[in-house]
Structure formats: structure tokens, C-alpha cells
Amino acid sequence: MTRDPIATARTLSEALPYLQRYAGAVVVVKFGGNAMGDEAAMAEFARDIVLMRQVGVNPVVVHGGGPMINELLGKLGIKSEFVRGKRVTDKATVEVVEMVLSGLVNKRIVQAINDQGGRAVGISGKDDDLMVCVADDPDLGFVGKPVEMNVQVLRDLYNAGIIPVVAPVATGMADNETFNVNGDTAAGAIAGALQADRLLLLTDVAGVKDASGEVLSQLTPSQVREMVASGTISGGMIPKTETALAALDEGVRAVVILDGRTPNACLIEIFTDEGAGTIIRSTEPRVKPRVRR
């Protein structure tokens, strides 16, 4: 492929205001969806995260792993049940969830980042009591709702130049209690506790769509609530927007729902005029106005 050096230089030059804007910023990235099962996509994601770290951004990666959990549960003959889009997690299931998230998925992402020249360390919500949970809903079993966040361990890691990679498994208030935490919920809680500049929720859709199916580039919290009430936002997008609104309430400056299958999606969002996906925020000045597609 022939590269245009002038175009490359122009792109780098146009990124300067955003490089300055995000120097030292904390960006929490929820990595999930089909990209997790694609080695090439994971390598590309890892490169983006390493580049963000290299130019002074402090990325914190939180991941899911639903497809891998389903695969192992199937092999073990354990049936999955879902209530309102969340996995019902009994004692046997939570052990499998922890095995997959903390032992398999987490270390794959850590290795992918390290293979790209970064320094990543994998932890779970149990480490240093990062996330302490109570049961989210009696119908869901060991599905946790974070009630205590202890994020100093994350600050210690990124202040040392290390990229934290967090598996959404948490401890409970009682001894020897383990909870499965929805990945988006965990990412939102971590972003709120860190007062992150951005929360990026990578998914398998281009963003939040209007009634005609067009992706909306920007939304305010009140617009999101209206779209949920009208049914325009439905299905799996509801918990994502709920996470976004909760994160904004906790002090996150903006949340972006974007397609993790898009090459360099994180870099496009952070470092270009166009941005990516749907940004949800209260009024906030930009370095300069974005022309969001």
C-alpha cells in the first residue's frame, strides 16, 4: 500500500490540539464484542492503547468476555440464563466466569498490549478491593453492583507508566464472596471513581441510532432519557446508555459509544476532528468544534 507522506504529516499536525488536550488525561476503555475473538482486531486495539500511552494519555482497559464464557459453560454442560440482558450467575457459573475473565481473557489482552511494546498488568476487581459489590438483583444470583471503589491501585499503575487491564470480577461484603459484574457497569464505575476525562464503550454497533436508523453523533443526557422513554433506544443499547448516564453523574466528562470493529476507533475518537460513534455529555467546550460523522 502506497502511503502519502504529506497526508500523514497533515494528519499528525491536525492531531496536535488533541495531543495537548489529552496529555495526562485518564481514558477508561471498555473492550468487548466480536473484536475480542479476532486476533488481528485485538492486536490493532492493543496498538491503539500503546500509542495512547506513548503520547501521554493514561488508558485504563476494562474488558468483558461473554462469548468465551458461553463457550466454556457449553463445554461444561452448564446452561446460561439471561434476565433483562444480564447473565444469571449461580455458584457454579461464577466460578467459570472468574476462570475465563481473570485467567484467560485478561491475560490475552495483557499479552497483546505487551507484544506491541506496552507495559500492561492484569488485575481483577478483587485485587486491592478495587470493586466491592452487593447483589444487583436477587433474580440474577451472583451478579454484582459496585458499592465501594478503591481505585488507588489503578492510579499507582498508570502513574508508573503501566496500563491496567481490569477483569470485571469483584469481591462482596461477606467473606469469600465473588460477583460477576457486567463489563459496561464495571467500566462506568471505574471511570466515575477516577473522574475520567473519557469513557469509551466499544461495542458491535456504530453508535446510538435515531428512529430512522441513522447514527447520532452527539447526545445530551436529557435527549438519551427521552429516547429511552420513547423506545427509540431499546434492547442492548439501554444498559449502555444507563452506564453512560451514571458515569456522567459521577463526574466523567463525556462517554462515547462506538464500534470496536472499526480500525483505530479509539484513536479516531480521541485525536481527530471527526470523532467516532456517539458522544454523550453535558455542555463542554472542545479544543475546536468537531465535525462528527
Curated annotation (Swiss-Prot):
It catalyses: N-acetyl-L-glutamate + ATP = N-acetyl-L-glutamyl 5-phosphate + ADP. SUPFAM superfamilies: Carbamate kinase-like. One of its GO terms (biological process) is arginine biosynthetic process via ornithine. It comes from the Bacteria. Substrate binds at residues 65-66, 87, 180. The record marks 30, 240 as: Transition state stabilizer. One of its GO terms (molecular function) is acetylglutamate kinase activity. Keywords: Amino-acid biosynthesis, Arginine biosynthesis, ATP-binding, Cytoplasm, Kinase, Nucleotide-binding, Transferase. GO terms for cellular component: cytoplasm. Pathway: Amino-acid biosynthesis; L-arginine biosynthesis; N(2)-acetyl-L-ornithine from L-glutamate: step 2/4. Signal peptide: none annotated. Belongs to the acetylglutamate kinase family. ArgB subfamily. Catalyzes the ATP-dependent phosphorylation of N-acetyl-L-glutamate. PANTHER family: N-ACETYLGLUTAMATE SYNTHASE, N-ACETYLGLUTAMATE SYNTHASE, MITOCHONDRIAL. This is Acetylglutamate kinase. It comes from Cereibacter sphaeroides (strain ATCC 17023 / DSM 158 / JCM 6121 / CCUG 31486 / LMG 2827 / NBRC 12203 / NCIMB 8253 / ATH 2.4.1.). The lineage of its organism: Bacteria, Pseudomonadati, Pseudomonadota, Alphaproteobacteria, Rhodobacterales. The gene is argB.
